[in-house]
Amino acid sequence: MAAKIIDGKTIAQQVRSEVAQKVQARVAAGLRAPGLAVVLVGSNPASQIYVASKRKACEEVGFVSRSYDLPETTSEAELLELIDVLNADNTIDGILVQLPLPAGIDNVKVLERIHPDKDVDGFHPYNVGRLCQRAPRLRPCTPRGIVTLLERYNIDTFGLNAVVIGASNIVGRPMSMELLLAGCTTTVTHRFTKNLRHHVENADLLIVAVGKPGFIPGDWIKEGAIVIDVGINRLENGKVVGDVVFEDAAKRASYITPVPGGVGPMTVATLIENTLQACVEYHDPQDE
């Protein structure tokens, strides 16, 4: 069987177009455009690329995009002070602080300082807790983007055995909660997991997020499985590959995401959706 390719680039563009139409309708109705503040500390080249793509996406859909590029020498106190100012700014619906932060700044303290209603990355413990309790508000972008891909391809997830490889706070853990909401029987594997192959071979839906090129061989994939590859790894020759050996896995899977052009574009598209949601649901004047 040759797998159908899940085209994240096309779906992400659809999502962004839908958001752009809603923003145009808001502005036409006399409401303000949503505002996103993107904070970058230091000059990490990968972070600069990510931030540029987020700012570009913002402007394309008609958001007000505010950029805060702070020097590497910025102190934790200065960064927290900026977040306090942005929390109090009624024209800003989302605050995004690009990770990783320089040494000496506590990521957890910074992410927890962002007001949960402006936490468009979905990392605040309040938002993660809401997802745990089956009452989500702003949801972590990559897991939510993956669920959107599955929905747009009309893949019925109820009753599937889902296996998540990797237990990070950004992808693996929140992904497991999204999969529970999507009706899956969910297993999360990590570096202490014994006999990883056994888990992979029994997965109807496999989500791999470890950041190691070719970590999952294609012959481990169950015939007809759905494979979602979150990894983005640049090889020495400049080629970008995922965590799964794509060519071999595509011979066995029913659906597979490519790298690049699979999950990556959905992360930014979901960030855009979250910012609109924050604006409409939490920051618009409510009818009394």
Curated annotation (Swiss-Prot):
Pathway assignment: One-carbon metabolism; tetrahydrofolate interconversion
UniProt source species: Escherichia fergusonii (strain ATCC 35469 / DSM 13698 / CCUG 18766 / IAM 14443 / JCM 21226 / LMG 7866 / NBRC 102419 / NCTC 12128 / CDC 0568-73)
Subunit and partners: Homodimer.
Protein family: Belongs to the tetrahydrofolate dehydrogenase/cyclohydrolase family.
One GO term describing the cellular component: cytosol
Annotated catalysed reactions: (6R)-5,10-methylene-5,6,7,8-tetrahydrofolate + NADP(+) = (6R)-5,10-methenyltetrahydrofolate + NADPH; (6R)-5,10-methenyltetrahydrofolate + H2O = (6R)-10-formyltetrahydrofolate + H(+)
Cited CDD domains: NAD_bind_m-THF_DH_Cyclohyd (cd01080)
Cross-referenced InterPro entries: Aminoacid_DH-like_N_sf, NAD(P)-bd_dom_sf, THF_DH/CycHdrlase, THF_DH/CycHdrlase_cat_dom, THF_DH/CycHdrlase_CS, THF_DH/CycHdrlase_NAD-bd_dom
Superkingdom per UniProt: Bacteria
Name of protein: Bifunctional protein FolD
Residues annotated as binding NADP(+): 166-168, 232
The enzyme's E.C. designation: 1.5.1.5, 3.5.4.9
GO molecular function: methenyltetrahydrofolate cyclohydrolase activity; methylenetetrahydrofolate dehydrogenase (NADP+) activity
Encoding gene, per UniProt annotation: folD
Gene3D superfamilies in UniProt: Leucine Dehydrogenase, chain A, domain 1 (3.40.50.10860), NAD(P)-binding Rossmann-like Domain (3.40.50.720)
PANTHER family according to UniProt: C-1-TETRAHYDROFOLATE SYNTHASE, CYTOPLASMIC, C-1-TETRAHYDROFOLATE SYNTHASE, CYTOPLASMIC-RELATED
